Amino acid sequence: MNLLDIIIIGIVQGISEWLPISSKTQVLISSHYLLNLPIAIAYSFGLFMEMGSIGSATIYFRKDIMSVFRDRKLLLYLAIITIITGLVGVPLYIISDKLLKNAYDPSIPMIILGIALIVDGLYIRYSRIKIRSFKDLSLKNIILIGIAQGLAALPGVSRSGMTVSTMLFLGIKPDDAFRYSYLAYIPAAVGAVGTTILFSKTNISYVISLIGIGGVLISVISAFIIGMLTIDLLLRFAKRRNIYIIDFTLGGIAIVVSVLTILI
């Protein structure tokens, strides 16, 4: 077991989870090359690694989480997003193994998402879209966000990219879009980890036999620490930028990383 490799995988998870570059795909690639994991097992490990990111979001947004439970409308909206995410995401997760075994290239959805973010930015830049709060959204808007998050169960599709871009398109101000995207992430990620353990128990056992429980814990803790720092930096960035600048930046990151993924 190479300790540096395990820490690197945790760092990859801690950074990529909060950017529109599909953390599960980045962990898939890094663990495939660093730990020599088969693709399907590396994908399951990528989802399992979200445990570290769940910790990051839960600790960072602990005050927001408490306020959610005091606000019935906000709690209802996040519950609906979670339910829709599960209805869309679980079937897609079940077929993900088959997709990865049939020459499915996860970098393609990242390129498409990057282009969509840039188009979204152009639309916002040249239209008179009304800025509103998350609680001003309609039920239809909330369902749309849930569908967007559920689609991220597919390899190469970024959860944060899908939800943040959808919220920006709906007129949510950037820092709120990031904040509520990350709050919606917590229950969805808990479900993703649970689904991974339920349907991919053999894959996770293989990883544990290879790097040990200690190795998995080190990787998860690395993801947790780096995730806290990344969330803070992104929220600071979002507060100081216009919506379309956020879209252009995230879209550019998604396209660059996906091209690098293809080259690797």
UniProtKB/Swiss-Prot annotation:
Q: Does the keyword Membrane apply?
A: yes
GO MF term set: undecaprenyl-diphosphatase activity
Keywords of this protein's UniProt record, alphabetized?
Cell membrane, Hydrolase, Membrane, Transmembrane, Transmembrane helix
Q: GO cellular-component terms in the record?
A: plasma membrane
- A UniProt-annotated Pfam family: BacA
What subcellular locations does the record give?
A: Cell membrane
Q: Which InterPro entries does the record cross-reference, listed alphabetically?
A: UppP
Coiled-coil positions: none
Q: Which domain of life is it from?
A: Archaea
Q: Which reaction does it catalyse?
A: di-trans,octa-cis-undecaprenyl diphosphate + H2O = di-trans,octa-cis-undecaprenyl phosphate + phosphate + H(+)
Its topology with respect to the membrane? Answer: Multi-pass membrane protein
EC supergroup of this enzyme: hydrolase
Reported EC number(s) for this entry are: 3.6.1.27
**TM region positions:** 34-54, 75-95, 104-124, 137-157, 180-200, 207-227, 243-263
Family, according to the entry, reads as follows: Belongs to the UppP family.
Function recorded in the entry:
Catalyzes the dephosphorylation of undecaprenyl diphosphate (UPP).
Q: Which protein are we looking at?
A: Undecaprenyl-diphosphatase
- List the source organism: Sulfurisphaera tokodaii (strain DSM 16993 / JCM 10545 / NBRC 100140 / 7) (Sulfolobus tokodaii)
Q: What is the lineage of its organism?
A: Archaea, Thermoproteota, Thermoprotei, Sulfolobales, Sulfolobaceae
Name of encoding gene: uppP
